[in-house]
Amino acid sequence: MKVAVLGAAGGIGQALALLLKTQLPSGSELSLYDIAPVTPGVAVDLSHIPTAVKIKGFSGEDATPALEGADVVLISAGVARKPGMDRSDLFNVNAGIVKNLVQQVAKTCPKACIGIITNPVNTTVAIAAEVLKKAGVYDKNKLFGVTTLDIIRSNTFVAELKGKQPGEVEVPVIGGHSGVTILPLLSQVPGVSFTEQEVADLTKRIQNAGTEVVEAKAGGGSATLSMGQAAARFGLSLVRALQGEQGVVECAYVEGDGQYARFFSQPLLLGKNGVEERKSIGTLSAFEQNALEGMLDTLKKDIALGEEFVNK
């Protein structure tokens, strides 16, 4: 199983590469790519960690050598948020980066599963889909927007509030991956109940958690370490499913039946071909139903922006 990380010299990329080097199954290959010249050195640094995961690093304009034979490609390349910016302010720079890298994936490893981490995910996934479609290699079961950070944040905040072990809590999060489009389904957490005020406050905190980190880092970056952990969790789940493990479920932002929007984050059963089954979002509370209806315009606009970027 070969995993490629594109944007591997950045804050998310390095954290993700470290976690994959220590946690991928024995015999896996890990390939690191970034435009920055430090990338081969990041691979050498990680190669000294004693795990049976082969690692190589590549830098420069051409990602091809890193992508050859990849089964999973995780894309975290791009610029990070600064205070006062929201994820959509990143669009102008990151849209071009994602388009370029996905074109290279389409050429070199068209059958790979692709996880898009680069923000704004609501839009960059639509860009990736349109690029793959133009290249004639789009498979909607193999393209994912990685929203796992919303899930792990939800798990952490709920566990803190309710005095639970974080590992015991699993909150499904649907919708998209920014602001109001992030919808934690708190009504579906087994064995935990919330007051209306708690639901309102928690939902808001989960939606704004990225901004909390950006402000706390005081201009020195955005959420890189928790995002690295979230991306590793998703990537490792995907690898396990591709290798035939049964019953692997993760939420991610994918193209589905279009009931709510062309792309939508929901629980997915993963398998040997990527998405095996898009699972139902279940019964929503009145608060959640309202929030879902209220976000769809924003989500659809984000998606249209990505489609237009490629097709203009």
UniProtKB/Swiss-Prot annotation:
The keyword Oxidoreductase applies. SUPFAM superfamilies: LDH C-terminal domain-like, NAD(P)-binding Rossmann-fold domains. CDD domains: MDH_glyoxysomal_mitochondrial. It holds the Pfam family Ldh_1_C. GO terms for biological process: anaerobic respiration; fermentation; glycolytic process; malate metabolic process; tricarboxylic acid cycle. Homodimer. Catalyzes the reversible oxidation of malate to oxaloacetate. This is Malate dehydrogenase. The lineage of its organism: Bacteria, Pseudomonadati, Pseudomonadota, Gammaproteobacteria, Enterobacterales.
